[in-house]
Amino acid sequence: MYLKRKIDDYLNDWKRSDDRMPLIIKGARQTGKTESILHFAAENYKNIIYINFALEAKYKTILSGGYDVASILKNITLIDPNKNFIPGETILIFDELQECPDIATSLKSFCIDGDYDVICSGSLLGLNYKKIHSNSVGYKKDYEMHSMDFEEFLWAKGYSETHIKDMLQ
């Protein structure tokens, strides 16, 4: 069962944005980053490419041909020929960014290319920006996700917006 989170509205606004850039979602472990991203992707995209660098170390080589979109997509396809990329309908989700921090360097290329939406997720624990070749400043957005707050807890318990508003006054 999916629990509504505040990031849901942020992700929907990001998707509707005309100047949508790749997104990095950071936060402590076990806060629901991956679950929220995958739920959003399933609701909004026909094609989801999900790569978890911690569980699938073989994907750490996708930058071997450079940081350009064509090289990265080619390398992903060489690892798994069943992964298809449909411009305008595909989202790439790079999870556990701290295991392959240089993927952040490629975000500039994805932003300029514009054919694919990209969300990266990573734990603040172990994400060392000093190890990143180039951080794609100006070509990405950052969002920090926190543990469920009281309002989100009330949503999960089934309280209506009216009841929550009354309680929080």
Question: What are the roles of these predicted feature ranges?
Answer:
Residues 1-169:
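Phosphate-binding site recognition
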